[in-house]
Structure formats: C-alpha cells, structure tokens
Amino acid sequence: MNNTQRIIVLDTETTGMNSVGPPYLNHRIIEIGAIEIINRRFTGKKFHTYIKPNRLIESDASKIHGITDDFLSDKPSFKDIAKDFFNYIKNSELIIHNASFDVGFINQEFSMLTKKIQDISNFCNIIDTLKIARKLFPGKKNTLDALCMRYKIKNSHRVLHGAILDAFLLGKLYLLMTSGQESIIFNKNIQNERNFRYIKKSITKKHRFLKIIKANKTELKLHNEYLKFLKEK
C-alpha cells in the first residue's frame, strides 16, 4: 500500500444484530465514526454522526454502546447523511475490524436508498484488521480490547463501545500491526465519543527523529484568542 493513499478507519454501532442469518437483517446503523490517515499520520479530519434508525434499539446492544432511543429521536436518518458519508469514504483504503459485520450493515443502508451503491467494496478497498490480527496472532483472542492490551495501548477510558473512539483505537492498532512497532501510549484526554477531542500522541524515543514544528507568535496569538472564545461560549 502506498503511504500517500488516503486511509479511512471506520466503526459503526447498531440497533443490535440478527442471531439467525445475516447480522444486519431487520437492524439498522445508529452511529458511524471514521477517521482519516495519510502518510501514516492522523490528519484530524473525521466523519462522525448519530443516526435515527426508525426502530427500537435492543437492550443488549444499548448495554454495549450506551445509546438510547430517546437520544436518537432528533438525529438525522441515514438518507440525510448518505451523500456526505459516501463522499468521505469513496476511493479510500477502508480499515474495519471484523469488516463483514460493518460492511453488511452499510451495504444494506445504501441499497435501501439507491441501486447505484449496492456494495461499497466497489468504491473503496476494504481491509479487515481482524484478518490481519489472526495471521499475526493465530489462536489468540483478537478483539479490539485484546489487541489494545497486547500492543500496550491504554484504553481504560473505553467503558462503552463508541464508533469514533473505537475508530481511533483501531487506527492506532492498524499502524502498529503494519509497522512492526511494539507499543504506543497516548494521552488520557480521550473522552467518550459524544465529547470527542482530537487525541495527542505521546512522543517516545522511537519518534525523536521527527522534526518538532513550533507555533510562531501569530499562530500562538490566534490560538489564545480561540481558547478565549471557547471559554466565553
């Protein structure tokens, strides 16, 4: 894969899953979180939305992600965000953990709206990190939590599943799994996805060759003015 290729790391949350047949059958997506990586670095550009599913969330699913029917009552439907979402992911390397699950749901959502998009794999290259993990660690548990523990990524803040937070964790894991690097630790300021903040990377000895770019006086002034504006909101 070319490092300049636009990578999108994606995760979804749903109303639940079908126990017999396709997991997506009779269920809907309620949250999409996606984060962009270029040149093996997070760009800070993301796509994040909650979605009103027009059906009730199963109690077991709500226990996993903490999203409720009341919370989604005023959120957009998938048709309202479909165009922006498609434009965000098209022509990208789409990184997903257990991709068949999320892709099945996404394909169902698009197929309900248009015949032009029946399978997103026709518009982007899908990479399943679960398959990568199983090749690297055959016979071991390869859930997101298990991989975070294995690669020493601190995720104690991850009390509930959430698409945007899980996408960031998965992005870190993907970079580690494809670089041979053993561990990375990042700032504890990650909040629940509903209060998402861009996460600062810890600088380790392995990164000391990177050039540190400091803000100039004008940039610092603008930054301080922005912080003042936020406090006044």
Curated annotation (Swiss-Prot):
The active site consists of 161 (proton acceptor)
- Tell me which GO cellular component terms the UniProt record holds: cytosol
Listed under catalytic activity are:
DNA(n) + a 2'-deoxyribonucleoside 5'-triphosphate = DNA(n+1) + diphosphate
- What's the cofactor? Mg(2+); Mn(2+)
- Which GO molecular function annotations are given, in alphabetical order? 3'-5' exonuclease activity; DNA binding; DNA-directed DNA polymerase activity; metal ion binding
**Quick one: a GO biological-process term for this protein?**
DNA replication proofreading
Task: Report the cofactor remark.
Answer: Binds 2 divalent metal cations. Magnesium or manganese.
Binding-site residues for a divalent metal cation 1, renumbered to this chain: 11, 13, 166
UniProt keywords, alphabetically: DNA replication, DNA-directed DNA polymerase, Exonuclease, Hydrolase, Magnesium, Manganese, Metal-binding, Nuclease, Nucleotidyltransferase, Transferase
Class of this enzyme: transferase
Which is an annotated Pfam family here? RNase_T
Keyword Hydrolase (UniProt): yes
Going by the entry's taxonomy, the superkingdom of the source organism is recorded as Bacteria
Q: Where does a divalent metal cation 2 bind?
A: 11
The catalytic activity of this protein is classed by the Enzyme Commission as 2.7.7.7
* List of residues binding substrate: 11, 13, 60, 65, 166
| Its biological purpose | DNA polymerase III is a complex, multichain enzyme responsible for most of the replicative synthesis in bacteria. The epsilon subunit contain the editing function and is a proofreading 3'-5' exonuclease.
Could you describe the subunit structure of this protein?
Answer: The DNA polymerase holoenzyme is a complex that contains 10 different types of subunits. These subunits are organized into 3 functionally essential subassemblies: the pol III core, the beta sliding clamp processivity factor and the clamp-loading complex. The pol III core (subunits alpha,epsilon and theta) contains the polymerase and the 3'-5' exonuclease proofreading activities. The polymerase is tethered to the template via the sliding clamp processivity factor.
**Protein's name according to its UniProt entry:** DNA polymerase III subunit epsilon
The taxonomy runs: Bacteria, Pseudomonadati, Pseudomonadota, Gammaproteobacteria, Enterobacterales
Q: Which gene encodes it?
A: dnaQ
